[in-house]
Each structure stands twice: as structure tokens, then as C-alpha cells.
Curated annotation (Swiss-Prot):
This is UvrABC system protein B. A motif (Beta-hairpin) lies at residues 95-118. It is found in: Cytoplasm. InterPro entries: Helicase/UvrB_N, Helicase_ATP-bd, Helicase_C-like, P-loop_NTPase, UVR_dom, UVR_dom_sf, UvrB, UvrB_inter. Forms a heterotetramer with UvrA during the search for lesions. Interacts with UvrC in an incision complex. HAMAP family: UvrB. GO terms for cellular component: cytoplasm; excinuclease repair complex. Residues 29-188 form the Helicase ATP-binding domain. Residues 607-632 are annotated as: Disordered. Residues 634-669 form the UVR domain. NCBIfam families: PRK05298.1, uvrb. One of its GO terms (molecular function) is helicase activity.
Length: 673
């Protein structure tokens, strides 16, 4: 497949300044010289993302940005989209809204079935990401650690593509059969992703990786007479194309002959496993593995896939025992560039994924729920990740020992902010009066319309403090680990918008969150040495106030610990360097006017594809709906109607009625537009 060689075109009203030009030059030079590992030490607000965008544009090579969580991935994706509107900027995170992996608890003899609800929008974005890597050179994929988990084999995936070309000789039956192999379904009523409809000699196909473009194939006898793109919602033509490639519905589709070969290998492994269980006198396990595996084989024979097909990925991808699974890295071009954001968090995360997954699967294998080959359906081990990773830039305000070691201690410094903003002033105050002291500081900040972050050591302390502040008339919210990604983004958005003034949390107010309105960070019990009060944690937390002109951090402690001292020293070093730069260049620190963007609605679709979890229907009044256009309203209406039908089909009539009421409200709004 020939790849388009379009260059990266960076759009920005700003030119690199401060430490950015030297950082861009050093990183680019290092990459051109073939350095495998480089570290960018960039403080909060120094424009690390802009620096990386410049490096990508200068190198003109495809890139993958790894973020430690979905919130930061969404933020990075939005920023990169703004920098490169003409290029392919994609988003690749876990597509599960809810995921319960299959597991067995021997102590209570409880088997937990796999249960999941898949977010269709994120699934489409994942397919779009791999398509861009395969088709285009000007691709940036922003991913979470989901990138190290097994994906379908890239060779099998490419083998399954359906290439359509103007004038090609192919009959209608063959096209429909190939679409069925790609797991597309025929649906002449509801035209949605991964479906096709047939009207005479016209086939309309809604590609799995697309959200707003469909393909119309017009045949004359056995010849493709016309290929045209159209808007699936309005039916408006978007122009003709000479050729088009239809990608499979999922990354896990496999050619028929490979499935048949895999089935033979699975049967062979099943024979060996049964012999082992009989020899060990484990008759229940022998019966269990036989029953489960034979059912899966039957399904694969008839349909080409089965529930939990990923557990047979070793055979389907033709890999040997213990070999690394195919992942997003296999789809990435060989000369790609890897940028690991907030590397001090992301790198340890990559290392920890394999072990947790392995422990759960070993129990399933031991008790006859899975064949031993299921152990090869796993995330990459850390050493495999290291072997697969291309040239890498680690980005962090507090790089970890691993990154420093890999870069041979040679760190690219980006401490000076183009805005002239200084690191927060740090004060240490006694613990005894910390709560009352924080309250008085909050009143000062609220009076000038600024926000406050407070970080505590325990959940109990955070809850009690939130209640206490609430009783004293403070508009306060508590951010805790039970809050899902989407709600977390909403809370941070509401804080910036001034819906409330104080946010209390434990370990949730650290890496990478952009909140220029926050002028005070209060760290309670700062003198309790440990993970939450380590040098890196303190620097990261203090950094949340570094985007404000009046930034200040108060550390409450009765003594200055080693970690506190290091954090204070490093913050002062950065402050002095910035001050010197400001004096030399006559810069007056400027407040950041970073506008509060519209909430990213990535993955906020109403309907999960499957899963036993009940889908919550939000009760919204008609004036909650403020879409940008009539087209968006119609799209939402279509989604709700589909959701209502699904609930009715599952005999969930109360939920169907709630959605029906929602549809009524939306139709009322539609009449006014």
C-alpha cells in the first residue's frame, strides 16, 4: 500500500520562545543523530506540547504520544488537533466503558464471566488510528497504555481489506460475501457504522473507521461503474473517488484458511490438556476445558469468530509460544517516533501491566477455564516494549531514574516559560492550624475570583475537609478515585468555569492538568514522607499553581523533610532561572488566558455495544441541549431512537420509556431550530 507523503503543517499564532528554540534544536539534532532515548525536562506551563509539535513538524515522521490516562490523552489529542488540523491526528485508548475480565476465585468456587460494554465512538477512533498509520506518513496517534495490549495481527488485518477500484470486474455477490467476511452486517433500515445496504445494483457501505463518510458502489453488470463518497446522515454527495479500501470491522478479523489452521492447532492443544487433567485426576477441570473449548471451536467454524476469540490469538496470529502479541506498535511505521508524556508515571505503568494480567490468567488455566495458550493473550512485557519502541523522547517535569539512566543523564532543559510566569512561591506552615489556615487563604482567593486545590493524604481526611469547608459556605467539590474519566474532566472544567472554587483530592491533582485559574495549592501533612509526599509528587502538585500570575504553594508540616527540601530547592532553581531570563529580555510575567475549551465529548455515546451493566439514562431538560447545528441534533435523535429500540428489544421497557421522553424533548428543540 503506497503511503501519502504529505508534510506536517504546524498551525500556531506563536513562535518558539524562552527555552523552546534550544529544546527543539537539541531534540531534533539528537533524533537525526540516531539517539534512541532523550529526556525533555519541561516545567508546567513551559509549552512542552508545543515543543514536541515543532519537533514532529521538523522531522516529518509519524509519531505516537503515550499518555498515562484517558484524561491527559484527551487533552493532548485536542492540542495536537489544533496544531495539525491538516494532518491525521488520531486517538487510541481502551474502548471499554465498563470491563469485567473473566476470572475464577478458587476459595469460593466463583467464576466471573467476562462482561463489557464497548464505546462505539472510541472503537471507531481506534480503527481510524490504525488506518492512518497504514495509509499515511503524516500521522500522530495519541494513545494511552492501551497501546501495549494485544491487537489483531497486522498482516492478517491487511490481507482482509477489500480494495475497490473503478472499472474493476467483480460481481455483487462477491462484494457482499467479502463484506460479511469483514464482519459487516446488512441493514437496509438503520444505516450505521459497519453496515451496508443494497438497492438494486447500488451498495452503500458505512466504513467501520469512519464517523461521517460512507461509500456508494454502483455496478453495471459485474463492473464497478462508480465509487462516490456521501454523508450518511443527509445523503449529500461528497464527490467521486477512483478507488477505496474497506477496512475490517475489528482488528481481530482473520482469513478463513488461517482460522481453519488455528482450529486444528487448538484441537491438538485440547487433547494434550485433557490428557494432563486425566493424569492428574482432575476430572472436573477436564470436562470444563473440553466443553468450553469445543463450543468455541464450533463458533469459529460457523461464524469465523467466538466470544473471547482473543484467547486464541497465539494461533490466529501464527506466533510461537511466549512471543510478544501484535500491538499498535506493529501498525506503526519503522521510522516512527515515540513520545512518552509524564514519563515518570507512564513508564512504571507499562512495566506493571503484564504481571497483574498474568496472575489472573494462570488461575483460569489451572482450573480448566482456558487453554495454556491463553497466557499469550497479554500486554507486552517491559523488556518487549523496550525492544519494540522506536526512537523515544521522555517528557516530564520530574523525570524518573529510568529515563535519566536511558538518556545517560543528558537532559534537555525547558525551565523558562515564554509567558515569563514564575514558579509558585512556597511557604511552609505548621500542621496544628492547617485547616483554619486553609479556610482563611480560600476566602482571600475567592474574593479575587481565583481557584484553590487542596491535597490530603487519606480519603477520610478529604471527605471530612470537604464537609467542613461546605459548612463554612465554601463552594467545594471532592475528586476521588471512584469518579470515572468523563466526570473527572467535567469537574475540572466546572472548576475552571467558576461553578465552584475549591477542589479537594488525594492523588488526583498532579500530572498535566491545565488549570490557569488555580492560584493556590495547599498540601496538607506535607511532612509525612511516602509516595504521596515524595519529591516528585510534591513538585508535580506545586506545579498546578505555576500557570497563575499569583501562584503560591503552602506546605503544611512541622518539619522540613528531605523530599520537601529537594522540592523547594528545585522550585527555587527554576524560579531564579525564569527571573533572570525575564530581566535579560525585559519580560513582564503575563497571565495565561487559556480559554476553557468545550468539553471533549470523546467516547460519550449513550449506547454501549454490549454488556450486562444497565445503561443509565440521564434525565435532561430540553434546554440542556445546546448542539452546534441541526445536523448534530438529528444525529443525536437517531442515536436515541436506536437506543430506545435496543431497550425495548431487551424488554427494558422503563428505560425505553425514559429514552422516549428524551426523544420528545429533543424533537421539541428541533422544531425551534
Amino acid at each position: 500500500m503506497s503511503k501519502q507523503g504529505k508534510p506536517f503543517i504546524l498551525h500556531s499564532p506563536f513562535k518558539p520562545s524562552g527555552d523552546q528554540p534550544s529544546a527543539i534544536a537539541k531534540l531534533t539534532e539528537g533524533l537525526n543523530d540516531g539517539l534512541a532515548h532523550q529526556t525533555l525536562l519541561g516545567v508546567t506551563g513551559s509549552g512542552k506540547t508545543f515543543t514536541i509539535a515543532n519537533v514532529i513538524a521538523q522531522l516529518n515522521r509519524p509519531a505516537m504520544l503515550l499518555a498515562p490516562n484517558k484524561t491527559l490523552a484527551a487533552q493532548l489529542y485536542a492540542e495536537m488537533k489544533a496544531f495539525f488540523p491538516e494532518n491525521a491526528v488520531e486517538y487510541f485508548v481502551s474502548y471499554y466503558d465498563y470491563y469485567q475480565p473473566e476470572a475464577y476465585v478458587p476459595s469460593s468456587d466463583t467464576f466471573i464471566e467476562k462482561d463489557a460494554s464497548i464505546n462505539e465512538q472510541i472503537e471507531q477512533m481506534r480503527l481510524s488510528a490504525t488506518k492512518s498509520f497504514l495509509e499515511r506518513r503524516d500521522t500522530i496517534v495519541v494513545a494511552s497504555v492501551s497501546a501495549i495490549y494485544g491487537l489483531g495481527d497486522v498482516d492478517a488485518y491487511m490481507q482482509m481489506m477489500l480494495h475497490l477500484q473503478l472499472g474493476a470486474i467483480i460481481d455483487q455477490r462477491e462484494i457482499l460475501a467479502r463484506l460479511a467476511e469483514l464482519q459487516y452486517t446488512r441493514n437496509d433500515q438503520a444505516f450505521q457504522r459497519s453496515t451496508f445496504r443494497v438497492r438494486g445494483e447500488v451498495i452503500d457501505i458505512f466504513p467501520a473507521e469512519s464517523d461521517e463518510i460512507a461509500l456508494r458502489v454502483e455496478l453495471f453488470d459485474d463492473e464497478i461503474e462508480s465509487l462516490s463518497l456521501f454523508d450518511p446522515l443527509t445523503g449529500h454527495s461528497l464527490g467521486k473517488v477512483p478507488r477505496y479500501t474497506i477496512y475490517p470491522k475489528t482488528h481481530y478479523v482473520t482469513p478463513r484458511e488461517r482460522i481453519l489452521n488455528a482450529i486444528e492447532e487448538i484441537k491438538q492443544e485440547l487433547v494434550e490438556r485433557r490428557e494432563y487433567f486425566i493424569k492428574e485426576n482432575k476430572l472436573l477441570e477436564e470436562q470444563r476445558i473440553t466443553q468450553r473449548t469445543q463450543f468455541d471451536i464450533e463458533m469459529m467454524n460457523e461464524l469465523g469468530y467466538c466470544s473471547g476469540i482473543e484467547n486464541y490469538s497465539r494461533y490466529l496470529s501464527g506466533r510461537k509460544e511466549g512471543e510478544p502479541p501484535p500491538t499498535l506498535f506493529d501498525y506503526m511505521p519503522a521510522d516512527g517516533l515515540l513520545i512518552i508524556d509524564e514519563s515518570h508515571v507512564t513508564v512504571p505503568q507499562i512495566g506493571g501491566m503484564y504481571r497483574g494480567d498474568r496472575a489472573r490468567k494462570e488461575t483460569l488455566v489451572q482450573y480448566g477455564f482456558r487453554l495454556p495458550s491463553a497466557l499469550d493473550n497479554r500486554p507486552l512485557r517491559f523488556e518487549e516494549f523496550e525492544r519494540l519502541a522506536p526512537q523515544t523522547i521522555y517528557v516530564s517535569a520530574t523525570p524518573g531514574n529510568y529515563e535519566l539512566e536511558k538518556s545517560n543523564g543528558d537532559v534537555v532543559d525547558q525551565v523558562v516559560r515564554p509567558t515569563g510566569l514564575l514558579d509558585p512561591i512556597i511557604e511552609v506552615r505548621p500542621v496544628a492550624t492547617q485547616v483554619d489556615d486553609v479556610l482563611s487563604e480560600i476566602h482571600k482567593r475567592v474574593a479575587v475570583d481565583e481557584r484553590v486545590l487542596i491535597t490530603t493524604l487519606t480519603k477520610k481526611m478529604a471527605e471530612d475537609l470537604t464537609d467542613y469547608l461546605d459548612e463554612h459556605g465554601v463552594r467545594v467539590r471532592y475528586l476521588h478515585s471512584d469518579i470515572d474519566t468523563v466526570e473527572r474532566v467535567e469537574i475540572i472544567h466546572d472548576l475552571r468555569m467558576g461553578m465552584f472554587d475549591v477542589l479537594v483530592g488525594i492523588n488526583l491533582l498532579r500530572e498535566g492538568l491545565d488549570m490557569p485559574e488555580v492560584s493556590l495549592v495547599a498540601i496538607l501533612d506535607a511532612d509525612k514522607e511516602g509516595f504521596l509526599r515524595s519529591e516528585r509528587s510534591l513538585i508535580q502538585t506545586i506545579g498546578r499553581a505555576a500557570r497563575n500570575l499569583n501562584g503560591k504553594a503552602i506546605l503544611y508540616g512541622d518539619r522540613i523533610t528531605n523530599s520537601m527540601q529537594k522540592a523547594i530547592t528545585e522550585t527555587e532553581r527554576r524560579r531564579e532561572k525564569q527571573q533572570k531570563y525575564n530581566e535579560e529580555h525585559g519580560i513582564t510575567p503575563q497571565a495565561l488566558n487559556k480559554k476553557v475549551g468545550e468539553l471533549l465529548d470523546i467516547g460519550q455515546t449513550d449506547k454501549p455495544k454490549r454488556g450486562k451493566q444497565a445503561v443509565k439514562v440521564e434525565e435532561k431538560s430540553a434546554n440542556t441541549y445546546k448542539p452546534k447545528s441541526r445536523k448534530e441534533l438529528e444525529k443525536e435523535l437517531k442515536q436515541l431512537e436506536q437506543q430506545m429500540r435496543d431497550f425495548a428489544k431487551d424488554l427494558e421497557f422503563e428505560k425505553a420509556a425514559a429514552v422516549r421522553d428524551k426523544i420528545g424533548q429533543l424533537k421539541a428543540v428541533l422544531l425551534e431550530v
